[in-house]
C-alpha cells in the first residue's frame, strides 16, 4: 500500500483506503465530482478517495486488505458510549463460534436481540470495524446485538461462514438466557455480505424449522452473483465499492458456478415459494451502489412472495455509507441507523 500524506477526518479514511481501478462497463458513469446524485459530504469523501493513488484492495493479500479497513475505521473518533461488550465462544451442531455480545448499559432483565453478520466481502471486517454501527443500533433500539465472528475467506469458503452464522443463531435462540437475552424475541441483521448472510439465515431457519425470527434487517445486501445489472455498470468505478472488487470478494467466497446459484449463496434466485413464510424484512439500499439493484430486486421478490417488506433507498449515498466512520455524522447515516433501530424495536417488543 502506498503511503499517503497525512490528512484528518473523512479525508484520512479516504486517503488510507485506495483508488479503485477502472472496470469494463457498458456505459460511462458520470465522474463523482460532476454527479448530482451524490450527496455533498459523500462527494467530498470520494474526491479524496479517488485521488489517493493507493493499491487496489483486490491486488493485495487478504491480510493486508484487512489492515487497510481496520486502520481506516480507527482513523476517525466515534461515539462508542452506552454499551457493554463481552465475548463468548459457543458450540452448536458441532461448530465452535465466537460471538461478541453488545448490550445497552443500565438495562436489567432478558432483552430482545438481533444477530449481526458483518460486511467486508466475506474477506474483510471484524467487530472493531463494525463496533460503531452496532453501537448505534443497540443504543437506539434497546436490544442486544450479537456479533458473529465467522471465519472469513479465503481461510474458509462457502458454506462455512453461513453455517457458522446459522449455528450461532440457533444457539442464541435456545440458550439466550446465558447471555441475558430472550431467545424468543430475535431478529437477524447484517450489512453488505452480512445482509446476504442475514437473508440466508432467515431462509435456513425456515427450511430447517429453526428459530422463529421476528425480522430480517438487510443493509445494502448482496443477493446474487450477477455483475451485469444496471447499477453494477453505472457505478462500476469511483464510488467506494467497485465492480472488480466485488468480483474479487465473490472469488474468495466461491468460484464454483453451481454453488453461486444455490439460494444459500444467492438468495435472489430463490423461488417465491421458497421465500413465502419468511419473517418481515427491512431493506436499505444506496442510490450510488453497485449492489443497489439486486438489493431492491430481493425486496420486490419477497413482497411478491407475500412477505411484509419495507424497502428504502437512500439517495445520494454510496455502498456501506452507514458503516464508514468518516460518514457517521452525515444526516443520511444518522437517519439510516435510527430508522433500522426503530424497525428492530417495533418487531422485538
List PLM regions with ranges:
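N-terminal signal peptide c-region/cleavage motif recognized by signal peptidases
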Residues: 19-21
Amino acid at each position: 500500500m502506498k503511503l499517503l500524506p497525512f490528512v484528518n477526518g473523512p479525508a484520512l479514511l479516504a486517503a488510507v483506503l485506495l483508488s479503485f481501478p477502472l472496470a469494463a462497463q457498458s456505459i460511462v458513469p458520470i465522474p463523482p465530482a460532476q454527479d448530482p446524485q451524490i450527496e455533498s459530504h459523500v462527494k467530498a469523501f470520494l474526491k479524496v478517495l479517488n485521488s489517493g493513488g493507493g493499491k487496489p484492495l483486490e491486488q493485495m493479500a487478504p491480510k493486508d486488505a484487512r489492515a487497510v479497513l481496520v486502520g481506516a475505521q480507527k482513523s476517525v473518533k466515534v461515539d462508542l458510549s452506552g454499551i457493554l461488550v463481552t465475548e463468548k465462544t459457543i458450540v452448536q451442531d458441532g461448530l465452535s463460534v465466537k460471538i461478541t455480545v453488545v448490550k445497552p448499559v443500565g438495562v436489567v432483565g432478558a432483552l430482545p436481540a438481533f444477530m449481526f453478520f458483518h460486511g467486508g466481502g466475506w474477506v474483510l471486517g471484524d467487530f472493531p470495524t463494525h463496533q460503531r454501527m452496532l453501537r448505534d443500533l443497540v443504543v437506539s433500539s434497546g436490544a442486544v446485538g450479537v456479533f458473529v465472528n465467522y471465519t472469513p475467506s479465503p481461510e474458509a469458503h462457502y458454506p462455512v461462514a453461513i453455517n457458522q452464522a446459522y449455528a450461532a443463531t440457533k444457539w442464541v435462540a435456545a440458550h439466550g438466557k446465558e447471555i441475558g437475552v430472550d431467545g424468543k424475541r430475535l431478529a437477524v441483521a447484517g450489512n453488505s455480505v452480512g445482509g446476504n448472510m442475514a437473508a440466508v439465515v432467515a431462509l435456513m431457519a425456515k427450511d430447517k424449522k429453526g428459530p422463529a425470527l421476528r425480522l430480517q434487517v438487510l443493509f445494502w445486501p448482496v443477493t446474487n452473483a450477477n455483475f451485469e445489472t444496471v447499477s453494477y455498470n453505472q457505478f462500476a468505478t469511483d464510488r467506494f465499492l467497485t465492480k472488480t472488487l466485488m468480483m474479487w470478494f465473490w472469488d474468495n467466497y466461491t468460484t464454483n458456478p453451481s454453488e453461486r446459484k444455490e439460494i444459500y449463496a444467492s438468495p435472489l434466485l430463490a423461488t417465491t415459494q421458497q421465500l413465502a413464510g419468511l419473517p418481515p424484512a427491512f431493506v436499505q439500499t444506496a442510490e450510488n451502489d453497485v449492489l443497489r439493484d439486486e438489493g431492491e430486486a430481493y425486496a420486490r421478490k419477497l413482497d411478491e412472495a407475500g412477505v411484509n417488506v419495507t424497502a428504502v433507498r437512500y439517495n445520494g449515498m454510496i455502498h456501506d455509507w452507514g458503516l464508514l466512520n468518516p460518514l457517521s455524522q452525515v444526516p443520511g447515516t444518522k437517519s439510516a441507523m435510527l430508522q433500522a433501530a426503530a424497525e428492530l424495536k417495533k418487531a422485538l417488543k
